[in-house]
From Swiss-Prot:
Location in or out of the cell: Virion
Chief place of localization: virion
Gene Ontology process terms (BP): symbiont entry into host cell; symbiont-mediated perturbation of host process; virion attachment to host cell
Family to which this protein belongs: Belongs to the microvirus G protein family.
Transmembrane residue ranges: none
Domain of life: Viruses
Subunit and partners: The virion is composed of 60 copies each of the F, G, and J proteins, and 12 copies of the H protein. There are 12 spikes which are each composed of 5 G and one H proteins.
Biological role stated in the UniProt entry: Major spike component. Involved in the attachment to the bacterial host. Involved in the determination of the phage host-range.
GO-annotated cellular components: viral capsid
Listed name of the protein: Major spike protein
Pfam families, alphabetized: Phage_G (PF02306)
UniProt keyword list: Capsid protein, Host-virus interaction, Viral attachment to host cell, Virion, Virus entry into host cell
Amino acid sequence: VXLSFAGTSYPIVGIVRFESAFDQPTSIAGSQIEHYPIEMSVGSGGVCSARDCATVDIHPRTFGNNVFVGVICSSAKWTSGRVLGTIATTQVIREYQVLQPLK
C-alpha cells in the first residue's frame, strides 16, 4: 500500500478485526476492536509505504458472530494526497505442521 501525505505527517497503519452478531453493524465500541500494527517506511516527499504481513484469526470467538477485518490509516495531520495500492488477503483453509524425528 502506498500513501502520500502533505507535510511531516506520519500515519499509523494497521489491520483491524472485530466481531458482531449483525450482518452490517452500524456502530462498533472501541473495546471490541483488535488492532494489528503494520510496519511503515517513509520515503522522500512524504510518501509512505507499508509492506508487512499479519495473521488474523477469522474464526469467531463467540458462536454465531460474524468476523470483520479491514485496514485503517490514521494520522495527526490528516491532509492526504492519493491513496494507491493493493491489499492482498489470503485465507488459509488448513495449516500443516511437519515434525521431523530427532536424530
